[in-house]
Amino acid sequence: MADQLTEEQIAEFKEAFSLFDKDGDGTITTKELGTVMRSLGQNPTEAELQDMINEVDADGNGTIDFPEFLTMMARKMKDTDSEEEIREAFRVFDKDGNGFISAAELRHVMTNLGEKLTDEEVDEMIREADVDGDGQVNYEEFVNMMTNK
C-alpha cells in the first residue's frame, strides 16, 4: 500500500514522523503519540493511544516504526471517510472558529507541534493553499490542500 506513495509524500511523512518521534530513536511510542495529539488539542486516553498503535504495529512490538507509519498514512489517504477528519483538522488550525486559517493560527499550531517555522515559511504555506489570494485559508482551500497532494 505504501508503494503507491510519491517521493514527495514519503518525504512529507518522514518529516511528520520525526515530529512524533520526539527522542529520535526511530519509533513512536504511546507516550510520544499522546504528546503530539495533546499539542493538537485532542485528549486521547491511554487505551485509545494503545489501540491506535496496535492498529498499525505490524511486528507487535508496541511501537510504530517508519514503514508502519507509512502504511498507516497510505491507509488514511485512501479512506473516503476522511471528510470528517479533514473538518476536524481544520478546526484544530482555525483557533478562533471564524472559518479561516490565518498565518498566526498556522504558526501557533506548527509551533505546538515543535515545528519552528520562519515567518517566510508560514507565509509560503498560506500562499500555496490560498487560492483566492485573501491571505488566509478557508475550508474549501484547506480541503483542496489536504486532498490534492
Curated annotation (Swiss-Prot):
Q: Which UniProt keywords apply?
A: Acetylation, Calcium, Metal-binding, Methylation, Repeat
Q: Which Pfam families match?
A: EF-hand_7 (PF13499)
Any idea which positions bind Ca(2+) 2?
D57, D59, N61, T63, E68
Chain positions recorded as Ca(2+) 3 binding sites: D94, D96, N98, E105
Q: Which GO terms describe its molecular function?
A: calcium ion binding; enzyme regulator activity
Q: Which organism is it from?
A: Ciona intestinalis (Transparent sea squirt)
- What is one cellular component GO term in this UniProt entry? cytoplasm
In Swiss-Prot or TrEMBL terms, this protein is called Calmodulin
Residues that bind Ca(2+) 4, according to the entry?
Answer: D130, D132, D134, Q136, E141
Output the SUPFAM superfamilies linked to this UniProt entry: EF-hand
Residue intervals of the EF-hand domain: 8-43, 44-79, 81-116, 117-149
Q: Where are the N6,N6,N6-trimethyllysine modifications?
A: K116
- Where in this protein does the record say N-acetylalanine is found? A2
One annotated GO biological process: microtubule cytoskeleton organization
Functional description taken from the UniProt entry: Calmodulin mediates the control of a large number of enzymes, ion channels and other proteins by Ca(2+). Among the enzymes to be stimulated by the calmodulin-Ca(2+) complex are a number of protein kinases and phosphatases.
By sequence similarity, the record places it as follows: Belongs to the calmodulin family.
User: CDD domains this protein is in?
Assistant: EFh
- Residues reported in the UniProt entry to bind Ca(2+) 1: D21, D23, D25, T27, E32
